[in-house]
């Protein structure tokens, strides 16, 4: 504590009184004296001191040094408690000036800005009256023009429907059915209606009318599940091929006569063939011909195989 107390008081003590004493007696000598003293004291900033002196007269530099001394005093107060004791001991007038800015730093910066604000307000004050003057003018315009306020009301109201055109009267020779409620624009172009009653239009139409009203036939619905019986084999009677057509009965006598005449020669030929070849021959004949002549040939073959005893 003892080491901190003597070190801070020595630099700040000369700086605040010198800054305040130089501008107060002679405002003109302030620019020369402050730069020399701040150079000796590195703590306070040298550039801010000449700016307030040049910007304003003797009245303005008084608050800025107090403002700049107040941050230094506030920094000293934050660093150590004994820093606050040297300023009052050095000069009594500086203590009251330093204490209020330290307590309320916000109002002091507004003091130099107050003339600027006042100057800004002064031009604004003449500009403020014109809006009131314009307001009465707008109100007078609104009061003088009531029709625009009432004009939008009819826009929102439903418009009346357009008048309907007069119905066209058909020519004297045209008969219009009474069921037609709307006017016919082409009534003059229509030919005279001479239709008979509905039941006597046409006999075909009368017959087809009930057929059209009948419901469609019931189609067989597909099976929901597969049948329990096994699938039909290709040899089943349902899928068997149709047999070849039988010979015409008129040709049967001629066929029998031809076979009887050719029987001896056929029997001789069949006797020369072996049994396997005969079986093959009968099979081919049964495929391409009806079974009746094959039965005859087979009977003849049996007669040849078993001759008379």
Curated annotation (Swiss-Prot):
Its main location: host cell. Residues 1-174, 216-240 are annotated as: Disordered. The chain crosses the membrane at residues 278-298. The keyword Transmembrane applies. It is found in: Host membrane. Residues 67-83, 113-125, 135-144 have a biased composition (Low complexity). It is a single-pass membrane protein. This is Uncharacterized protein ORF3. Keywords: Host membrane, Membrane, Transmembrane, Transmembrane helix. One of its GO terms (cellular component) is host cell membrane. Residues 1-17, 24-51, 84-112, 160-174 have a biased composition (Pro residues).
């Amino acid at each position: 504590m003892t080491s901190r107390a003597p070190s801070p008081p020595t630099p700040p003590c000369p700086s605040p009184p010198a800054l305040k004493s130089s501008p107060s007696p002679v405002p003109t000598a302030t620019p020369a004296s402050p730069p020399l003293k701040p150079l000796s004291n590195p703590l306070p900033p040298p550039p801010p001191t000449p700016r307030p002196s040049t910007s304003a007269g003797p009245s303005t530099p008084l608050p800025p040094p107090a403002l700049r001394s107040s941050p230094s005093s506030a920094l000293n107060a934050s660093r150590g408690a004994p820093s606050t004791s040297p300023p009052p001991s050095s000069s009594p007038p500086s203590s009251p000036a330093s204490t209020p800015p330290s307590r309320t730093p916000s109002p002091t910066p507004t003091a130099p800005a107050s003339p600027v604000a006042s100057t800004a307000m002064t031009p604004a004050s003449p500009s403020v009256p014109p809006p009131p003057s314009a307001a009465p003018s707008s109100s007078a315009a609104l009061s003088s023009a009531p029709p625009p306020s009432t004009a939008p009301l009819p826009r929102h109201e439903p418009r009346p429907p357009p008048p309907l055109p007069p119905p066209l009267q058909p020519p004297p020779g045209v008969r219009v059915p009474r069921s037609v409620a709307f006017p016919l624009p082409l009534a003059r172009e229509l030919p005279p209606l001479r239709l008979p009653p509905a039941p006597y239009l046409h006999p075909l139409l009368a017959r087809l009318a009930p057929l059209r009203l009948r419901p469609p036939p019931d189609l067989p619905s597909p099976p929901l599940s597969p049948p329990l019986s096994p699938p039909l084999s290709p040899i089943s009677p349902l899928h068997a091929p149709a047999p070849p057509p039988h010979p015409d009965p008129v040709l049967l006598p001629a066929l029998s006569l031809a076979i009887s005449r050719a029987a001896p020669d056929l029997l001789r030929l069949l006797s020369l063939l072996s049994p396997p070849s005969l079986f093959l021959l009968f099979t081919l004949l049964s495929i391409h011909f009806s079974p009746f002549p094959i039965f005859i040939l087979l009977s003849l073959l049996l007669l040849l195989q078993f001759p008379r005893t």
